Amino acid sequence: MKLQSGVAEFGQLRDGIHRAVRPDGVRIFVKVRHDMPADFFLAEARGLAVLSSAPLRVPDVISVWEHGIALEDLGRGRASARDWENAGRGLADLHCSAGERFGLDSRGWCGDSTQDNTPDEDGFHFFAERRLLAQGRRAFDRGLLEHDDMRQLESICARLCEMLPKQPPVRVHGDLWMGNVHACANGELALIDGGAVHYGWAEADLAMLTLFGEPPASFFCAYETAAKIDKTWRKRAALLNLYHLLNHLNLFGASYLGGVRTVLRRYS
């Protein structure tokens, strides 16, 4: 592996995930994927750079190359109630950073799926075309969705402006499930895995935080106190999470089909 010649200690945590110690004693976290395109880890490095100016901690990028990335090792600890409150305020601050358009100047990755970030001034069109329909068409082409499913999805996309409030494009993580909120060695919470970062809807980040488990109530209370956001956002979370359910359907197969269809029936 490319980095091994420059480290004093090197160990594998699991396939493609390594911890190492440099000769100067700095601990680093290394991810390697030879099965992904060259921009996979570049997207993560770019995303972490976009997030880095916000109060929420992100790992420093030490090195990135065609098939890997070396990051600051944040360690692993346990977050306190105060840490969660600080993270809520930090995410609110992140979402205060507005962009001129939705998207980003390069494509991203949500898990192992490419994410089209072609900039768009219309958030409803961006979410429909670059998120919902992109994943829906991929699933249909692979035989995971049927014609009726696509008709329902297209109906939803045509009426997004009736079901969701108009929101500005703000800096978002884009893949903000609980697994990407990391408790550092000192308990401080950090955002990791930045490949899906773009300018999008703040509500979409909040919604995904409720998809696979969720932070304590104090996190959301701190967020809502600090942010200018419609506090009824939870009512729209299922619709916003349809993107991630479709993505999981494409990545992991039919076990996610029931969840996708539940949302399609509810909103179509």
Per-region residue spans from a language model:
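Hydrophobic alpha-helical segments that form the core
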Residues: 238-246
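ATP-binding pocket architecture of kinase catalytic cores
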Residues: 9-18, 22-125, 129
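Juxta-kinase regulatory segment immediately upstream of eukaryotic protein kinase catalytic domains
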Residues: 1-6
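ATP/Mg2+ or Mg2+-diphosphate-binding catalytic cores
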Residues: 248-268
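Active-site Asp-x-Gly
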Residues: 121-128, 137, 167-171, 178-238, ...
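Short strand-connecting beta-turns/loops that link adjacent beta-strands
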Residues: 23-25, 66, 185-188, 242
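A general structural signal marking secondary-structure boundaries and capping sites
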Residues: 55, 95-102, 139, 164, ...
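An alpha-helical support segment within catalytic cores of ATP-dependent transferases
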Residues: 99-172, 184, 266
